[in-house]
Amino acid sequence: MNDMPGLALPNASERYLQGIVGRHQWLRDGVMPSPLEFNDFIDHAADLLSDFDTVPAIWGKLSAVLRQRQQATGDTAWHRSLRDHKIAAMLHDEPTTAWSFRKPRGYSGDAHLIDFLYEHPAAAPDLNAASPLGRALNAMVVSSSASVAVQERRRLLASYLDMTAERVPNAEALVLACGHLRELEFTRSADRLVRLMALDQDPVSVAEMRRCYSGLASLCPVEASIGRMIVRPLVHGRFDLIYAAGLYDYLDDTTAERLTLGMLSALKPGGRLLFANFCRDVVDYGYMEAMMDWRLIPRDEPEMQRLVDRLPGADLANITMFRGLNRTVVYVLVEKRG
């Protein structure tokens, strides 16, 4: 019982956090730890994680420390030592982290991984099979800044599908690297589209999309790589909306430039092109690279502007660049001249 009115006692998570900061002076001072101090922190974090009630206290500090180490070293040697530490097995109890690290589909950021971040029912069996520690860690992963940005992106894409269907008679839309196309579940007007062509190179994703959304008559799932859009951008005709929201994070500048030009050429007059990229300063990157083996090619506004600058100005009616609500993803909306 608290015998001092007006004085709130710290909860368990706050007490753990106070203990972490108290033991590791450099955390409080905001300075770079030495390799010895970093290793001591990882040892301490692993010891605390044996009680999964400590997860909320540890998660934020762990993410920040891994990001700090990533930025300071500029190499991946520290990944190997961290993955050999007992903390790696504990963190891989978290199903999203384990899936990303194992890469069952052979590449990073696959559609089932995104289902984890969406907290979609398709990922529920994996989560239900996780340990208590894994489930506690999952609550942190899905509420991280990168995950929240992905969740917001899903709603944003649904809104652009709706706007296009409501704005343009007989509208046609093209989605590149569509994954499972889960944004369809948030739309209200997708059934008004005459054609919704959804391309993905992963046959498992295309099959899942067909299975889940077979009732949408306008949906045209296609198993294809983005190379088709680069080499033959008009092979599927022209569209009122084209978007590639989760693709640019994996493209080098040359490929991104060529793809952007190809998508613009496949727009109808007055059509809209939306593409997006994770920004550079995201605290989750250290954890993603070290524990999930998931690497992105981040871009801020200047890099995105350079992609836009490669487009023929005569074709452009308007360009809007904006960030998502938590400032983690930058979007570019290009409107083609009518």
Name the predicted role of every residue range.
Residues G179-L193:
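Conserved SAM-binding loop of SAM-dependent methyltransferases across substrates and taxa
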Residues M1-D126, G134-A139, S143-S145, Y160, ...:
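N-terminal accessory segments
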Residues V231-I242:
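A short acidic, Gly/Pro-enriched loop at the edge of an enzyme's catalytic core
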Residues D202-V204:
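Conserved SAM/SAH-binding beta-strand->alpha-helix loop
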Residues R295-A314:
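Short alpha-helix
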Residues F278-R295:
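Short, glycine-/aromatic-enriched active-site segment of Class I SAM-dependent methyltransferases
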Residues G270-F278:
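Conserved beta-strand signature within the Rossmann-like core of class I S-adenosyl-L-methionine
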Residues Y250-M263:
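A short, conserved alpha-helix within the catalytic core of class I
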